[in-house]
From Swiss-Prot:
4-CDP-2-C-methyl-D-erythritol 2-phosphate binds at residues 8-10, 34-35, 56-58, 61-65, 100-106, 132-135, 139, 142. The record marks H34, T133 as: Transition state stabilizer. It comes from Citrobacter koseri (strain ATCC BAA-895 / CDC 4225-83 / SGSC4696). This is 2-C-methyl-D-erythritol 2,4-cyclodiphosphate synthase. Binds 1 divalent metal cation per subunit.
Length: 159
């Protein structure tokens, strides 16, 4: 078994909506990013890549490459997952923590879990997504952006 950890953060800027966990969430602000700015899927992709020792999302999909401008993070997650499976890994489980003062994530979490399970080809019982605030402390608490942490457990397939 191998464990990976991922982290991502994006500042608010421009107009909404925002995309988190593949879900389009109405909000008056957008997130500044080269791709679609999906902090949840970016952190999750990093966790999975880290567990498989395949680097990180920036190495695989660099923000200096115009091909990834406005990229759909679900596509990036699926491509990373294909590479991980090619190394002989299966999924144990993933756990994602979204850190945001606003907008509220709770109503959107069930659909986030559905999308992640679809993209990883796993059961929803293998996917947990939760959200928290920082009690108005720090940049997320001041409403300057959104952060996310994720962990992933991979299992080497039997030979």
């Amino acid at each position: 078994m191998r464990i990976g950890h991922g982290f991502d953060v994006h500042a608010f800027g421009g107009e909404g909506p925002i995309i988190i966990g593949g879900v389009r969430i109405p909000y008056d602000k957008g997130l500044l990013a080269h791709s679609d700015g999906d902090v949840a899927l970016h952190a999750l992709t990093d966790a999975l890549l880290g567990a498989a020792a395949l680097g990180d999302i920036g190495k695989l999909f660099p923000d200096t490459d115009p091909a990834f401008k406005g990229a759909d993070s679900r596509e990036l997650l699926r491509e990373a997952w294909r590479r991980i499976q090619a190394k002989g890994y299966t999924l144990g489980n993933v756990d994602v923590t979204i850190i945001a003062q606003a907008p509220k994530m709770l109503p959107h979490i069930p659909q986030m879990r559905v999308f992640i399970a679809e993209d990883l080809g796993c059961h929803m019982d293998d996917v947990n997504v939760k959200a928290t605030t920082t009690e108005k402390l720090g940049f997320t608490g001041r409403g300057e952006g959104i952060a996310c942490e994720a962990v992933a457990l991979l299992i080497k397939a039997a030979k």
